[in-house]
């Protein structure tokens, strides 16, 4: 409980909805975050999580969360629609802010007032494993530095574009530091 109380954010993976114990832990974590005014971010994780565990996912975002991360397919599944604008409206109903990744097209983010579209830099993608996790981690890192949602989306798009150029779900430390220097100048 102290770890949650002393945090700025809790990040809940949508995959937790598949297991009764994982789902219970996610709901308890969210409740503790609310108790201590800690912001909650939820990742939808996979279109299948939204489709086949919809009730559990809905329970995880019930009452609203600060931030949702999802890709376009997950957003469409959440909105039960075929158009991004409809999906955006559905996510606005459960999240004060959100980011929808669009693969090679970049991302769309909502900061509570403005919708931002960020284009991705063209890259030669060899493996998309880890792109969503890299995006979420980079976005939250940028926010922890005091950056705006737009700047966080720009940095996260750059970072996700970097990880897909390699096999494996993550970048090594030097590559992460290089990205930070490239984007933030430090």
Model-identified regions with their sequence ranges:
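Short amphipathic alpha-helix with an adjacent loop that forms part of the alpha/beta core around
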Residues: 1-5
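Short SAM/SAH-binding signature in class I
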Residues: 8-9, 136
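Conserved beta-alpha-beta core of the PfkB/ribokinase-like small-molecule kinase fold
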Residues: 9-89, 105-106
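Conserved phosphate-binding/catalytic region of the ribokinase-like
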Residues: 31-35, 55, 59, 80-186
């Amino acid at each position: 409980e102290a770890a949650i109380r002393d945090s700025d954010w809790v990040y809940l993976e949508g995959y937790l909805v598949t297991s009764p114990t994982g789902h219970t832990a996610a709901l308890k974590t969210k409740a503790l975050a609310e108790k201590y005014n800690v912001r909650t971010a939820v990742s939808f994780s996979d279109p299948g999580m939204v489709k086949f565990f919809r009730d559990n996912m809905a329970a995880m975002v019930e009452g609203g969360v600060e931030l949702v991360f999802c890709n376009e397919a997950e957003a469409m599944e959440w909105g039960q629609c075929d158009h991004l604008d409809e999906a955006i409206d559905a996510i606005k109903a459960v999240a004060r802010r959100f980011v929808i990744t669009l693969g090679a097209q970049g991302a769309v983010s909502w900061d509570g007032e403005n919708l931002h579209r960020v284009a991705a830099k063209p890259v030669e993608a060899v493996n998309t494993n880890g792109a969503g996790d890299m995006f979420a981690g980079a976005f939250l890192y940028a926010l922890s530095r005091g950056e705006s949602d737009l700047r966080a989306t720009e940095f996260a798009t750059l970072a996700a574009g970097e990880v897909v150029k390699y096999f494996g779900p993550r970048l090594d430390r030097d590559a992460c530091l290089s990205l930070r220097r490239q984007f933030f100048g430090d």
